[in-house]
Every structure is written in structure tokens, then in C-alpha cells.
Amino acid sequence: MSNYVVAMEAAWLVRDVENSDDAIGVAVSEAGKRLNDQDLDYVEVEAGVTGCPACGEGLDAAFLAANTALVGLVLELTVFNADSDEHAQRIAKSEVGGALRDVPLEVIDVIEDGDAPAEEA
């Protein structure tokens, strides 16, 4: 059994904001609060980055229209003692998905973590 770092992308809707910086701040704060309420404080929440289609430069993953924003968040956690990367993905989606109901989640990266010590079962 191995440990895996699983990164997921979440689409977070924020209402009544006037700019993308505010939207990102609200999205990160709300997601963090919902995760912490479920004792998932080990999940790291960051604003996502998307590439400019013209130049490839990284831009904040936030789209704002009519004072409503769709913010892309990156959620990252370490899954201990998983049988495979697919197993780690299922565990991560189950843990985070339970706390963030009605929030679309997609696994974007899974890395086997050889540095973290395996927890005893």
C-alpha cells in the first residue's frame, strides 16, 4: 500500500461580487470553511490557474459576469495506504465530495508520495 497526493479541480459559484479577486477570496474562504466544518482541515485549497489561449500565460481561473463568478479551485490532499492511484482517487473524491456536496470535482493529478511515512492501519 502506498500514499498518494491527489489534486482535484472544483468549480465554485460566487454571487454578488464585483471583481475576480473578491470572487477568488470568497471561494477559497467558503470552500475552506465547509471542509473545516467536516474536519477536513488537511485539504489544501488554492485558486486555480488557467492558461491564456493566445499567449499561454497563467491567469486566475475566475470568470465574472453580472456580479456572479465561476471560480476554479484546486484541492489537494494526501491519501494514505491506498492500493492504487485509482483507489486513491476514489478515496479523495469520497472524502471531499461529502463535504462539498453539489460542487463539481474532477481529479487532475495523482502522484505517488514516497516521502510520507505510511500510517499504520
Curated annotation (Swiss-Prot):
Pfam families attached to this UniProt entry: DUF555
Domain of life according to the entry: Archaea
Listed InterPro entries: UPF0212 (IPR007564)
Family: Belongs to the UPF0212 family.
Protein name: UPF0212 protein VNG_0879C
Organism for this UniProt entry: Halobacterium salinarum (strain ATCC 700922 / JCM 11081 / NRC-1) (Halobacterium halobium)
